[in-house]
Amino acid sequence: MTIENFNVDRLSLTLYAADTADRPLVVLHNYAGDGSAVMAALKDLHSPDLNLLCIGNLNWDHDMTPWYAPPLSPEDTPCTGGADEYLPLLLTEILPKAKERISGIPPQVGIAGYSLAGLFALY
């Protein structure tokens, strides 16, 4: 496995590229970190070889939300509904740059996330 860090726009990306060609690509949106804990957990679980692209430095309450939602508490921030703005960046810039860096063509591309990133993955 090779690990490569790169940026697209304001985003920090970490690609854990599979040693074998033509392995699936999983895109994981992170609130914090580079996904190293996720990759370690996958290894511990004896996961099949895959490419993992971790995307960080997101504007979490904007990029991951499809619609506006007010704050849940006085200390919270609103969700501002920027998923429609972020999705084209993911599809036209981030994914092509990640695919350039992996071996072969991924037979599947999946998207994963937790919390608001899980909502975005379903969106």
Positions of PLM-derived features:
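Active-site loop->helix "elbow" adjoining a glycine-rich segment at hydrolase catalytic centers
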Residues: 86, 115-118
